[in-house]
């Protein structure tokens, strides 16, 4: 997602920004779903035409546009995964919903967008970044659990 923001700013404004700046933009004003009150942030980088440092303002709608392809990939992956879900697991998902984990879960309003697209309950893990590692550790420690959560092709 950071790379998508970096490329968007480069393409639209001819401004080269760093990865950390792109990440700060995502964290501060990035959103997967339109916000009631759009926000903006001042961005500093190097003008690719003149080579001189430059400052500009980018708003949350532009960031959402920059993230659209990444967000659509997430949506498509969720849909494909749900379509291939065994009936027993599908029933659990309808009852309990989907829990978002990982860095993407921290993107504002991703849960709202996925709820709208899937009509399923969506929650964000209490600690989305650690949840992946903890979950993987639990599965690797329990061979029976590993077989129940993996698909064989």
Model-derived features with residue positions:
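Acidic, glycine/GT-rich loop-and beta-edge segments that sit at the periphery of enzyme/chaperone cores
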Residues: 18, 138-153
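Glycine-rich phosphate-binding loops at beta-strand->alpha-helix junctions
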Residues: 90-114
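Interdomain boundary/hinge elements
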Residues: 16-21, 92, 127-128, 150-151
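Active-site lining segments that contact anionic ligands and/or coordinate catalytic metals
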Residues: 38, 53, 95-96, 119
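Phosphate-binding glycine-rich/basic clefts of nucleotide- and phosphate-handling proteins
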Residues: 1-68
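Phosphate/ATP-binding catalytic cores across multiple sugar-kinase/actin-like superfamilies
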Residues: 66-93, 139-142
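Conserved phosphate-binding/catalytic loops in two-lobed NTP-binding clefts
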Residues: 112-135, 146, 152
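Residue-level signature of catalytic and energy-coupling elements of molecular machines
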Residues: 5, 78, 100, 136
């Amino acid at each position: 997602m950071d790379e998508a923001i970096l490329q968007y700013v480069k393409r639209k404004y001819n401004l080269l920004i760093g990865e950390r700046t792109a990440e700060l933009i995502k964290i501060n004003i990035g959103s997967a779903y339109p916000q009631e009150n759009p926000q903006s942030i001042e961005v500093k980088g190097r003008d690719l035409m003149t080579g001189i440092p430059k400052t500009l303002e980018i708003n949350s709608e532009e960031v959402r546009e920059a993230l659209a392809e990444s967000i659509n990939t997430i949506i498509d992956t969720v849909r494909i995964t749900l379509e291939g879900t065994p009936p027993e697991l599908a029933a659990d998902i309808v009852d309990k919903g989907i829990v978002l984990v990982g860095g993407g879960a921290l993107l504002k309003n991703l849960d709202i967008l996925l709820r709208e697209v899937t009509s399923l309950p969506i929650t964000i893990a209490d600690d989305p970044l650690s949840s992946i590692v903890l979950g993987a550790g639990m599965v690797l420690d329990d061979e029976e659990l590993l077989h129940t959560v993996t698909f064989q092709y």
